[in-house]
Amino acid sequence: MLGIILSTILLSDTVATDRVQNLDEVVIVSEARRGRKRSVKGQVASIDEHLSELRNVSLVRRGSYAWEPVVNNMQTERLSTTIDGMKIFYACTDKMDPVTSYVESGNLQSISLNSGLDGNPQATGNIGGSLDLKLRKAGFDNNPFHASASAGHEWNGHVQVYGADAALSSHRTYLNAGAFYRHADNYKVGGGDELQFSQFQKVNVFANAGLRLAEKDMLEGTLIFDRATDVGYPALNMDVAKAEGLITSLAYKHLFRKASWETKAYYNHITHVMDDTTRPDVAIHMDMPGDSWTAGVYSLLTTALRQHDLALNYDLYYNRLFADMTMYPGGAAPMYMVTWPDVGTLNTGLALTDNISIAHNQSLRLSAKVAWQQQCLHNEEGYHALKVFFPGMTDAYHQTTGRIAANYALSIKNYALSIGAGWGSRAPTVTEAYGYYLNNTFDQYDYMGNPSLKNESAVELNGAAKLSVLNSQLSVEGNVFLFSNYIIGQFENRLSAMTVGAEGVKVYGNISHATIANLSLTWDWQISEHLSWNEKVSYSSGRDADGDPLPLISPISWQSELQYQNQRFQAQATVKGNTRQSSYGEKYGETAAKAWTILNFSAQYQFIVHNSQFIVSAGLENLFDKHYATYADWNHIPQKGRNIYMNLTFEL
């Protein structure tokens, strides 16, 4: 197969057309496109609000900032998140800084989702799914000059958003750059009470540049600097003084008649500093900094051979993770502890994807990846601290992981059907393998890593069907993941907790099997040319080897949306909610979330003045000022109460 791809490339001599990835879903960030999802707040919306538009995505919320994406009811450990194909790793042991928090809406063109084991080429360990945040680039041969500015305000929490960017483009070069600023005070929950420590502020600047070396050869570079300060986390015991990311890349592209070849080298550095100095009645003050450094490269070839659309990707990255903690007990000497022992991870992998057109109404998608990684512990103090509990451990480990998936799709008149299956595995994360006394406020236990963990694996089965009748569509889709060696924290009564107030200690371990299943039903009705109605109901289930519920599995959720749209104006009313969480992970420290329902309104109007486009949007969220928390709100911190927002975007 590789020989066929290379032969095709060598025989080609003209510019290729753009290849389109087979994605489960895309949400547009920077511009509206018919048939593609977009947040009602437009580009002023936060990354978290854009992510919430994706069908299989929910978000774990620990405060107003940096929500953790969850795909198919699986959190960060079982997902792959890349930024334009680049691997980036968070630097906080408490997962307070997901990868998505280090970019802004102004940086992005779109966010793409591959559900389950059929990941994007650079994805590794993506049992639940993979997210790729596509950067917004001016590109060659586009508008010679383009500029835009955005401003937004939300009354609840006095959220202020300001952004501006400009772009230059020609046949030989392009450049686009911009800056974004967000600031929020504490917000009020339903009923009017202020939620302390829910404030944040953030600055983001970025630049993308391209140079055409020859007609078919191009260089592209990216620089993003993102800095959040004074970030409150009301669900946790600590806040964040600084979360800072520097993201850089340099890519070379060569185009052929029916193929393209891109090679990108990248480097990023994430710094995260937790802070409890603003909290009242702190028993023991703690400093908890963390750092993540990643350097990597990938090389991607794409081509079309008759009925085949092929993609071959090689990637390699090296990541270092280090975190420590210093405790300052009153009247005693400071106590120092390494929580991530400077773990260096070298990972390399090869992926192949083939989209096959069997007939005009049938297609088959095949994808596979194999990856090898080696991890070394570079901090002697952290290594020897773990070795006390695991005498047989060494300071170096290696794992081999992989995935393979197939999906068949058939379309006949008003019917569409797809079925798929896959198998994949993932290596334990640094926290799961080498974390040292990491306090988890979800269940109030200290967690210990386990270097002897086995790789986790899963078999995925999925299917979807769609029926179109007159002006309506009825869709049903579902998947089930059958896990082996599922990794989760397990009680260890022989160890004593270190954190003040902790219930005890858990050590990560493998359980023989677990199951996560998801099912959704969607109905879309185009009532008239301008009026549409959408209904959706989702059900999920997660069980461990003993048949007990897994934590953070969504209860039944539902949403009903009525939308009016013409060329320049659109408005929508949305009612959404969850049922009471009757099946929850009590065994794992979870408590049940109550049922809730809220009503939102939004509207948007576009107009042109002297060749400049203006977009005004406004909305009312949680109309009845409902006091509620979702199942994914950490420690049931309540959501915002009634909120009014207004945004303005100007494009020249």
Segments predicted by a language model, with ranges:
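Outer-membrane beta-barrel signature, preferentially recognizing the C-terminal barrel domain
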Residues: 236-257, 288-294, 339, 343-345, ...
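Flexible loop and strand-edge segments within Gram-negative outer membrane beta-barrel domains
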Residues: 184-187, 192, 196-202, 212-294, ...
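Conserved C-terminal beta-signal and adjacent last beta-strands/turns
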Residues: 203, 210-213, 354-355, 401, ...
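N-terminal periplasmic accessory domains that precede
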Residues: 43-51, 67-70, 82, 98-101, ...
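Surface-exposed extracellular loop regions of Gram-negative outer-membrane beta-barrel proteins
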Residues: 227-229, 269-273, 320-330, 372-396, ...
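Short acidic/polar hinge/loop motifs at secondary-structure boundaries
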Residues: 87-116
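Extracytoplasmic beta-strand/coil segments of soluble accessory domains associated
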Residues: 51-87
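Gram-negative outer-membrane beta-barrel transporters
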Residues: 357-364, 370-375, 379, 468, ...
